[in-house]
A protein has these predicted regions:
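Mobile "lid/hinge" segments at catalytic clefts and subdomain interfaces of large enzymes
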Residues: 1, 83, 117, 124-219
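Accessory "access/gating" subregions that flank catalytic or transport cores
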Residues: 1-135, 139-142, 228-242
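Long, charge-rich low-complexity segments
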Residues: 208-237
C-alpha cells in the first residue's frame, strides 16, 4: 500500500505537517478559521477587540488529561519565566476522575499559580453558567475558549462578546499574553524583570503514568437485594407514578 498508494485509493492527499500552525476559530461561528500568523491583519481589518479579557479551557470538550497537561506545561513556563497572566483564566475539568488525577499530578497547581480558577466538572461558561467579572456586561470585547461553540451571546449573554475557539494550550498562551494577535511561534513577551522571553512548544502526556484515580466517582451501587426497598411516591403526584 505504501509503495503504490494510487493502486489502492482513488485519491491520495499529502499533508506537510511542518507547514501547519495554530488556528483560532471565530468570532460568532466555529467555521471561521484564522491561523495565528494572520490574526493581527484580520483583527485590524474587521475591528475585532485585540485585548483578551478571559481565557476559558475545559468543559465537555478539550478537557482530557492530555489537554490539561498541555495547558499546564504552558502555565509552568509562565511561572519559570516570570510572566504575569494578563487575562482572567478558568479551568473546567472534563470529569471528577480527570480533575482528581490532574490535581494529584500537580497540573492544577501550576494552572492555579498563574491565577487560574478551577470550576465545577459540569456545564459552565460554555453555556453562560458562570459569574463573569466585567465592568461593563454590554461592551465589545474578546474572549478565547477551548469550547466547541462560540455563537453570539452563548458564553455570557452579550452579543458584543467576540469568542474565539482554540486548543487549551493556545488559549492558555493567549491568556498569558492578553493579546489576540500574539503568535506564540514567533512573538516574545516581556516578563516582570523587563526581559523578552518566548514560550516553548507545549508538551503533554496522553495518559497518566500512575493511571487514573478518583476518590468519589459519584456512583452508588444498587442494593444486592432490592426486594425490601420501599419507594414512596405521593398518591396524587402528577410527575411520578409507579
Amino acid at each position: 500500500v505504501y509503495a503504490n498508494p494510487n493502486k489502492y485509493f482513488d485519491q491520495v492527499i499529502e499533508i506537510d505537517l511542518s507547514t501547519l500552525e495554530p488556528h483560532l476559530n471565530g468570532p460568532f461561528t466555529p467555521d471561521r478559521a484564522t491561523p495565528v500568523s494572520a490574526m493581527k491583519k484580520e483583527a485590524e481589518k474587521n475591528g475585532w477587540p485585540k485585548e483578551v479579557e478571559v481565557g476559558l479551557i475545559g468543559s465537555c470538550t478539550n478537557s482530557s488529561y492530555e489537554d490539561i497537561s498541555r495547558a499546564a506545561s504552558i502555565a509552568k513556563q509562565a511561572i519559570d519565566k516570570k510572566l504575569k497572566v494578563q487575562a482572567e483564566y478558568t479551568i473546567t475539568p472534563g470529569s471528577e476522575q480527570v480533575r482528581y488525577t490532574v490535581q494529584r499530578d500537580g497540573f492544577l497547581d501550576d494552572l492555579e499559580k498563574i491565577g487560574g480558577v478551577v470550576l465545577a466538572n459540569a456545564c459552565g461558561p460554555c453555556i453562560g453558567q458562570w459569574a463573569r467579572h466585567t465592568n461593563d456586561p454590554d461592551k465589545k470585547n474578546t474572549i478565547v475558549t477551548s469550547f466547541n461553540r462560540n455563537f453570539a451571546k452563548r458564553n455570557d449573554g452579550n452579543p458584543q462578546t467576540h469568542a474565539f475557539v482554540a486548543s487549551p494550550e493556545l488559549v492558555t498562551a493567549l491568556a498569558i499574553a492578553g493579546d489576540l494577535t500574539f503568535n506564540p511561534v514567533t512573538d516574545s513577551l516581556v516578563n516582570e524583570n523587563g526581559e523578552k522571553v518566548m514560550l516553548d512548544p507545549p508538551s503533554g502526556l496522553e495518559l497518566p503514568a500512575k493511571g487514573y484515580e478518583v476518590e468519589d466517582a459519584g456512583y452508588q451501587a444498587p442494593a444486592a437485594d432490592g426486594s425490601h426497598i420501599q419507594v414512596d411516591v405521593k398518591p396524587d403526584s402528577e410527575r411520578l407514578q409507579l
